Amino acid sequence: MLNRTPQLLGPFDLPETLQTTARLVKEAGLEERITFLSGDFNRDPLGGPYDAVLMSDILHYQEPDANAALVRKVHQVLNPAGRLIIKDRFLDEDRTTPPWTAVFAVHLMVNTEKGRCYTLREASNWLTAAGFPEIREIERSSIVEGVK
């Protein structure tokens, strides 16, 4: 992503996770190009303003209220016309397809306290409630975008 997007700032993640990320970035020779933002996205300020925020594989580890609050929080730190891109594993409305996501949903139910897979409609509802007037499904069952 850094090679394709020169203006990319860098990841916001927990300090423990960023240690691994920093090592990988250094191995790729990109340490001069990236700024690490350390914190807990549910509790700490996100900084900003930003033109775009990518939330990757976050929703399925949280409860619906936490997801709705996080989407609202991201909306507040976006520039006008800013984009929130959510990459996750979305179930179809029948909650049994696509097959890989349905299997992953069972894995989350068995192995986590709060984890589950959501539908695209649920994610879209969080985006709408946060104030995103434009919502697009970018890739079926995995990527949705809200434009401020």
Where do the model's predicted regions map?
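Alpha-helical subdomain
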Residues: 2-148
